A protein has these predicted regions:
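Basic, alpha-helical terminal appendages of large translation-related enzymes
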Residues: 1-5, 19, 45, 49, ...
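Short, charge-patterned binding micro-sites
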Residues: 50-56
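A charged helix-plus-loop insertion that forms the helical arch/lid used to bind
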Residues: 60-73
């Protein structure tokens, strides 16, 4: 990968049902990082898509009375439409039923066969259709007369069939060595510890084909076998870069991937199986896997099977997309589970967006319109209050790149919204409305610094609330190519003589 390039992915979503808040959460996280990197002058490739093979899809299609591909065409379109409704900035949307993906999977399979890492044997063990995952005997318990996975709580069934196996056991020490040399491969650190403990407990060879289903990519020269959905699905991160065409610019520019954003429930596949497949194929693993927590309704994970889903589209229609994006990013701590509710959403909109940032923008723009004819000119005479605000802002912004590079999104947002709070306080303390008659120069300095603060805050919030941010930056008449993070290196955003346009209300308070 070239320097200052950034390849970020969401998990590709399993379209066995309608999208829910968990899908929205993963996608928005990835979009925020992608937008932030673009604002920091990185060349970004942002991928999302749908994972369309496997037994669960086959059964869902049968239930709907459709052929699997027809079913996938319908549901995948819903997920693709969701990217627009979530205001995602993805560069590609991949489907695992596309020819480019089949080509990549077949090539990777052949490499693993030739390297001796895949062999034919017989599988006997527990399998979860819901998880599309195999489980060991020690990972199974009986509950209410049914066998379930201790990992996910999903029901499992006993399976016996001929199967190709990947020699995962041969990669145990090599994976542990890889984790040791790449200490930030898995974040947060709690997830890293989980993975290391799992690998240290002993790895068994992994079944990577099925003969008991028909919907999937056929094993080359063994068409009675279908490639295991996870080996198939994970390869999407390569196929979007036209692998195996490794001499093309797209692949050379963006592999290895900078960041896989995933839910913690699929961490094992991304942090154990995926790097093992890649290392066996002599392909560099991704730089980072970030396993975020679950979005909870009360104390339970939101999922289709539990019927406790909050519909993101309903919330967008009722509250707005910027509002939902901000709330999800602010509410859920770094890598932890987060419980959401409409009440806490409304409180967040009121406290942070309407009363804080929105109020700051509105009061400054309105005052300049009514008292300065939308023009403000600063002088070099800074007051102690001006210097104090500038210093406090610099202290809050100096670690923002690091926070984002370590996926500390909620810490990032707390710092940014605190800058808005401090700027509101500065205006309250300095009272520019009292200076119009006797000290116009000081009034102008206060207003100009306030505009500079608003510009910085809006650029920093742009990855999270891009629609509102654009309205403010448009009204500040800041050129598109100047809406970047160069001010973190000491550059000004607002010219010494600022001309602004009118600004409508950004966020309405919810009563």
């Amino acid at each position: 990968m070239k320097k200052n390039n950034f390849y970020i992915t969401t998990p590709i979503y399993y379209p066995s049902g309608q999208p829910h808040m968990g899908h929205a959460y993963s996608s928005i996280i990835a979009d925020v990082f992608a937008r932030f990197k673009r604002n920091d002058n990185f060349k970004v490739f942002f991928l999302t898509g749908t994972d369309e093979h496997g037994l669960k899809i086959q059964k869902s299609a049968e239930k709907a009375g459709l052929k699997p591909l027809d079913y996938c065409n319908e549901i995948s379109k819903i997920f693709k439409d969701l990217t627009k409704k979530l205001n995602l900035s993805n560069d590609d949307f991949i489907r695992t039923t596309e020819k480019r993906h089949y080509k990549s999977v077949n090539y990777l399979w052949d490499k693993l066969i030739k390297s001796g890492d895949i062999y034919l044997s017989k599988y006997k063990g527990w399998y979860s259709v819901s998880d599309e995952a195999y489980y060991n005997e020690e990972e199974i318990v009986e509950k209410n007369g049914k066998k379930i996975s201790t990992f996910s709580g999903s029901p499992v069934e006993w399976v016996e069939e001929d199967s190709f196996f990947f020699k995962l056991s041969a990669w145990q020490d090599k994976l542990l060595d890889f984790y040791e040399k790449n200490k930030k491969f898995i974040l947060p650190s709690s997830r890293r510890n989980e993975v290391i403990q799992f690998v240290k407990s002993g790895l068994k060879d992994l079944s990577v084909s099925r003969t008991s289903l028909s919907w999937g990519i056929k094993v080359p020269n063994k068409n009675e076998h279908v490639i295991y959905v996870w080996l198939d699905a994970l390869t999407n991160y390569l196929s979007a870069l036209n692998y195996p065409n490794i001499e093309e610019d797209l692949y050379k520019d963006f592999w290895p991937a900078s960041l896989h954003v995933i839910g913690k429930d699929i961490l094992r596949f991304h942090a154990v199986y995926w790097p093992a497949f890649l290392l066996a194929a002599k392909i560099d693993p991704p730089i980072r896997v970030f396993g975020h927590g679950w979005i909870l309704s009360g104390d339970e994970k939101m999922s289709k099977s539990k019927g406790n889903i909050l519909n993101p589209l309903e919330i967008i229609n009722n509250y707005g997309i910027d509002e939902l994006r901000y709330y999800l990013m602010k509410e859920v701590s770094h890598g932890s589970d987060g419980s959401i509710s409409l009440k806490s959403l409304e409180n967040c909109i009121n406290s942070d967006l309407a009363n804080n940032y929105g109020n700051l923008c509105q009061r400054v723009f309105s005052f300049i319109k009514n008292n300065c004819k939308n023009k403000v000119k600063k002088t070099k005479n800074l007051s102690n209050a001006d210097i104090d605000l500038i210093n406090k802002t610099n202290n809050l912004t100096k670690n923002l790149r690091s926070e984002m590079d370590n996926q500390n999104l909620n810490n990032y947002l707390k710092s940014v919204i605190n800058i808005s709070f401090l700027t509101n306080k500065y205006i309250n303390d300095e009272e520019p409305w009292k200076l119009k008659k006797d000290n116009v120069e000081k009034m102008n300095n206060i207003l100009h610094l306030s505009l500079e603060q608003i510009a910085k805050i809006s650029i920093l919030l742009n990855p999270v609330i891009p629609l509102a941010s654009k309205k403010v930056l448009d009204s500040l008449n800041i050129k598109e190519d100047s809406r970047n993070l160069s001010f973190l290196d000491g550059n000004a955003v607002i010219p010494s003589e600022a001309n602004i346009s009118n600004l409508d209300i950004l966020f309405r308070k919810i009563n």
